[in-house]
Curated annotation (Swiss-Prot):
This protein's record includes keyword Transcription: yes
Residue stretches of biased makeup (Low complexity): 57-68
Organism of origin: Caenorhabditis elegans
Gene Ontology biological-process entries: DNA-templated transcription initiation; positive regulation of DNA-templated transcription; transcription by RNA polymerase II; transcription by RNA polymerase III
GO cellular component, one term: nucleus
Protein name (record): TATA-box-binding protein
UniProt function note: The TFIID basal transcription factor complex plays a major role in the initiation of RNA polymerase II (Pol II)-dependent transcription. TFIID recognizes and binds promoters via its subunit tbp-1, a TATA-box-binding protein, and promotes assembly of the pre-initiation complex (PIC). The TFIID complex consists of tbp-1 and TBP-associated factors (TAFs). General transcription factor that functions at the core of the TFIID complex.
Biased composition regions of type Polar residues, renumbered to the chain: 69-78
Amino acid sequence: MNLNSPAVSMLGGDTPAHGGPNSVLGGQGPSSILTGHGPNSVMGPNSILGPGSVLNPQSIQPMQSQQMHSLQGSSMQMHSHLANSNLNLNINPASVGPDRNPGSVMHHNLDINPPSVAYQNLTVPMTPLAYSVYDRDALTHQAPASNIAATMVPATPASQLDIPMPALQNIVSTVNLGVQLDLKKIALHARNAEYNPKRFAAVIMRIREPRTTALIFSSGKMVCTGAKSEEASRLAARKYARIVQKLGFQAKFTEFMVQNMVGSCDVRFPIQLEGLCITHSQFSTYEPELFPGLIYRMVKPRVVLLIFVSGKVVITGAKTKRDIDEAFGQIYPILKGFKK
């Protein structure tokens, strides 16, 4: 190819080096891309800067700095300043350029349809913009009011939550009926009563509610066992006294007294009984050949504890429920020190 020929010049102009109808830099040839009216021109009337182009000079309107407000729920606002901006980014697909060419999407008339962005304050009433996770700490998110009251959790120390509470298993109480009794007559006429003087010198009587057992002696003394609370033991003793009254005896209900309370608890961990017996030898007795549990005699309160390797603890000898709770509260930290 002869590059000096005017017909094949690629750099524009009429000289052998810069001219010709096929110039890409000058003239009005079909291959010109910088000037002229060629179909490939980037600056001509049919170029990307032409009247029907996207970047029409008339579609670029100067605009002062405005604030964009985007509603995020009821409490979130996003402020964005378009400082020193020369583009009005109100994009409406239905708008046209100044020459009514449908190719322009930026129009200086800013025709506003209901779904489009508002012109003055650029408020978007349709879908709120999603905010970043980094903005959540700086935003105060206000949830709608709820009819459900907030649950208040008391600040209870963890040490109190870990300590189990002992439960009453048996209460032994005594009553004086104040009259001599014929035990044979009681055994013959009363229900659920048995009397065998060769084995035991008392009538054994049982009732179902409260589920208890009474030992009635000829002297008028009575022992009530099996109740789970002091109130239940008192109620059962009164029922036994009423049964004796219905058999013709002038029985009274006097001198009611709780003699023994038995409670039990599970600490839920195995215990080293040998180490406990050696460390607390002054209060402990442990003979695994005779009894599998360690016998711990506490001085104050004056109770006896039976401690087993499985973690079960039986407290007996107490007069009140408070004594049982106090004794277990003292022994529990000691048992944790000998946890296997």
